[in-house]
Amino acid sequence: LTAFITYLSQVLTALNFLANIFLQGTRAAASNRRLSEVMNTRPDISDDGASRREYRVEKGSIEFRNVSFRYFKNVGAPVLDDVSVKIEPGEFVGIIGSTGSGKSTFVSLIPRLDDPDAGEVLVDGINVKELSLYELRESVAVVLQKNTLFSGTVAENLRWGNEEATDEELEEVCRIAQADSFIRSFPDGYETQIGQGGGNLSGGQKQRLCIARALLKKPKIMILDDSTSAVDTATDAAIRRAFRTQLSHVTKLVIALRISSVMDADKILVLDEGRLAACGTHEELIQSCEAYQEIYYSQKEEGHE
């Protein structure tokens, strides 16, 4: 009887093992189908079958001419509605507006993550639709509020921006992004291991590393979408000063919730329900733009200024 029970137990264990293999195989097949769907999906915007100008962006000027955009064609109000503005090479431009005003959509049209329904977006005076996607996107660096960091060293994560970057270049961009000091405080410095997603770093440290990584691209246009939200105001101000003194040749667009992050911008765009409500310096807008005044004084009362 003991032998029978032992053999039966072994048979049941084997059957259970086979059942698990079958279950895992079924799951793997389903995962493969989903991956295949993603891999075989053609992007809405591509260079396939089109003749593009192999022009490398040199100046970084940006112009929106009567641009309108909807995410769902002919449904609902436009996210951007007849927006026209010109941004000169090297300018520091702040973008302010309430949630849903179209700020992120505005900057997404520059590297052609989306195309406008009407109007034109020009870079260096050329419609972005006429430019090679590769050359256009090589000239634009985008830093989001939440970016991805990978398992590996600090240096390895930074070099995703430029695999050929030297150690000196890494240190230079980290000084601009105000990241060099905290990196050097780690026992292993630039060889410090980062956990998946940057779990062993603070939010502000992750954002500064992502800014440094974007700078390694040596872009002509730099877009920061609320990418210093987790950084204290003193460090935020230091980053802006470094941008002004060391990145005067780069056109900088900064989306910010805190007006203090863009008060010293060359110009500030105020978006309100998809329309460009006003454009000017902080001093001009505080006198003339009701939407800007409302944001400024509400933040001042809350102690953000």
List the model feature ranges, each with a label:
Residues 1-6:
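Membrane-water interface of transmembrane alpha-helices in multipass transporters/channels
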